[in-house]
Amino acid sequence: MKKINKIVLAVGGTGGHIIPALAARETFIHEDIEVLLLGKGLAHFLGDDSEIAYCDIPSGSPFSLRVNRMFSGAKQLYKGYVAALQKIRDFTPDLAIGFGSYHSLPAMLASIRSRIPLFLHEQNIVPGKVNKLFSRFAKGVGMSFAAAGEHFHCRAEEVFLPIRKLSEQIVFPGASPVICVVGGSQGAKILNDVVPKALARIRESYSNLYVHHIVGPKGDLQAVSQVYQDAGINHTVTAFDHNMLGVLQASDLVISRSGATMLNELLWVQVPAILIPYPGAYGHQEVNAKFFTHTVGGGTMILQKYLTEESLSKQVLLALDPATSENRRKAMLSAQQKKSFKSLYQFICESL
């Protein structure tokens, strides 16, 4: 097999796509492979990180049912395609890997046009439109969950999704239990509104309760913090946390959306969770949550339309019961031990 020297990662959009791509990038860098990220929205997520080679290119969704949006999306998509084509010609990669979402479309199209081998990585159990469509042109798909395989038109195999690095161990002295609240990389207003009030209801049952609440970039830190302060709950409220793995390891319970990255990290550290799936995006988060709660047994799910202070506080009290928590941790450990530990890099080498 020809040595792989350069790889393009076609990625963009939210953390659910970008975080797995960055984790995969680390494994490729370890193999002395040069990596370039191409996609829309990278500058917003990566900022001035000089260690990561990336190019933010335009893109648009061609899937809108509104004609004006469809044409606008197609126009942006073409601009991005032209830009990606030039970047790929300059970079001369040996292969490209798409991580889903329309933000990655220009780079994936340019890779196919340049006759570069294309691979895909699918984070969710129900793939999005882009990965399902492009699997017809791909050499293989590495999946975080084996159940996604039935949706693809090429070789598909479960691979180990790299976990974000642990920056440092986190300890909350004297705190018990510790609850982590996170609404994904973009935050979730309903979690910011409902969760603090729900946890205020259980304050009398847990005098040493500590809450680490990640509100997202648009969240109102002051308003969320005020609810905890009024309830006498020790807490930290932040817009983002770069040591997510450390926070999860220090937690007794997580209240979160059910994106694929979060589920993989929860399984890795075996921390039970209450999941409130995002109701849009073709329902993939609900499928993720059902897998985690029903198949794995790692927690419980509350659909957003049923999320109230009362419904959540009841589930939190149940989740913090020692026997319930221990059973859920054991179930997660069992599920994690059954998962594949073949890396995406190994899968690609076998498929070339």
Swiss-Prot record:
Entry binding sites for UDP-N-acetyl-alpha-D-glucosamine: T14, G15, G16, N124, R164, S185, Q285
Keyword Lipoprotein listed: no
Example GO biological process: peptidoglycan biosynthetic process
Pfam families attached to this UniProt entry: Glyco_tran_28_C, Glyco_transf_28
Encoding gene per record: murG
Catalysed reaction, written as an equation: di-trans,octa-cis-undecaprenyl diphospho-N-acetyl-alpha-D-muramoyl-L-alanyl-D-glutamyl-meso-2,6-diaminopimeloyl-D-alanyl-D-alanine + UDP-N-acetyl-alpha-D-glucosamine = di-trans,octa-cis-undecaprenyl diphospho-[N-acetyl-alpha-D-glucosaminyl-(1->4)]-N-acetyl-alpha-D-muramoyl-L-alanyl-D-glutamyl-meso-2,6-diaminopimeloyl-D-alanyl-D-alanine + UDP + H(+)
Keywords attached to this entry: Cell cycle, Cell division, Cell inner membrane, Cell membrane, Cell shape, Cell wall biogenesis/degradation, Glycosyltransferase, Membrane, Peptidoglycan synthesis, Transferase
NCBIfam families on file: murG
Family: Belongs to the glycosyltransferase 28 family. MurG subfamily.
Domain of life: Bacteria
One Gene Ontology MF term: undecaprenyldiphospho-muramoylpentapeptide beta-N-acetylglucosaminyltransferase activity
Recorded topology in the membrane: Peripheral membrane protein
UniProt-listed Enzyme Commission number(s): 2.4.1.227
Protein name: UDP-N-acetylglucosamine--N-acetylmuramyl-(pentapeptide) pyrophosphoryl-undecaprenol N-acetylglucosamine transferase
Purpose of the protein: Cell wall formation. Catalyzes the transfer of a GlcNAc subunit on undecaprenyl-pyrophosphoryl-MurNAc-pentapeptide (lipid intermediate I) to form undecaprenyl-pyrophosphoryl-MurNAc-(pentapeptide)GlcNAc (lipid intermediate II).
Pathway the protein contributes to: Cell wall biogenesis; peptidoglycan biosynthesis
PANTHER family cross-referenced by the UniProt entry: GLYCOSYLTRANSFERASE (PTHR21015:SF22), UDP-N-ACETYLGLUCOSAMINE--N-ACETYLMURAMYL-(PENTAPEPTIDE) PYROPHOSPHORYL-UNDECAPRENOL N-ACETYLGLUCOSAMINE TRANSFERASE 1 (PTHR21015)
TM stretches of this protein: none
Organism, as annotated: Chlamydia trachomatis serovar L2 (strain ATCC VR-902B / DSM 19102 / 434/Bu)
Keyword Cell division: yes
Subcellular localization(s) per the UniProt record: Cell inner membrane
Record's GO cellular component terms: plasma membrane
